[in-house]
A protein has these predicted regions:
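Terminal regions of secretory-pathway proteins
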Residues: 1-190
């Protein structure tokens, strides 16, 4: 288990950006169908886009309008000034800027300074995270000593992710030297 956790902390997953969907997830080999024996391949990147379309997620420009953001006006703006990417997107979407899928558009957005994902994605993240926190009774009405105990609340107040990991996996202490934020990639030293 420590090896897996160490890998999560030191292996950089890559930026959440266009053309960075892991190749192995774009060409998954499924087990053979028991009835037919046929083995199929699956492109999870395409599945993500298809599911958004099936769920009725608006296309990128409409999504931006609904967030009160300006829609992109041309392919070059969408591609963040990358002329080659702009041409490729225009070809894929057959010149129809309004047809660009939301996920594709968000992956194309330039990242704000210090951000791990686009401004549009960040706005949705904030809305969803705050909604989940506000609707969880253990963070709201039941966040009290009668439920957690006073020592439990104290533990929550004083403990961070680094301490939680080390409490359960003390053998990883070497990996946390000079690590102030365990949610960022660790040093990777052994």
């Amino acid at each position: 288990m420590e090896d897996a956790i160490y890998s999560f902390g030191t292996a950089h997953p890559g930026a959440i950006t266009i053309k960075n969907f892991p190749d192995f997830l774009r060409n998954l080999t499924l087990p053979p169908d028991p009835a037919t024996g046929i083995q199929q391949r699956l492109d999870l990147g395409a599945v993500d886009i298809l599911r958004d379309r099936e769920r009725g997620v608006p296309r990128y420009n409409e999504f931006r309008r609904q967030l009160r953001k300006e829609p992109v006006k041309d392919w070059n703006e969408l591609a963040g000034g990358d002329v080659s990417l702009a041409k490729e997107l225009e070809t894929v979407y057959e010149g129809k800027l309004e047809d660009v899928d939301t996920m594709v558009g968000m992956f194309c957005e330039p990242l704000p300074e210090g951000f791990g994902f686009s401004d549009t994605a960040f706005r949705i993240f904030i809305l969803m995270a705050s909604r989940r926190l506000k609707s969880d009774r253990f963070f709201t009405t039941d966040y009290r000593k009668e439920i957690y105990t006073e020592s439990g609340l104290e533990w929550v107040r004083r403990t961070g992710m680094k301490q939680i990991i080390l409490r359960h996996h003390p053998g990883l202490e070497f990996a946390f030297q000079n690590v102030s934020n365990p949610f960022a990639p660790w040093c990777g030293r052994q």
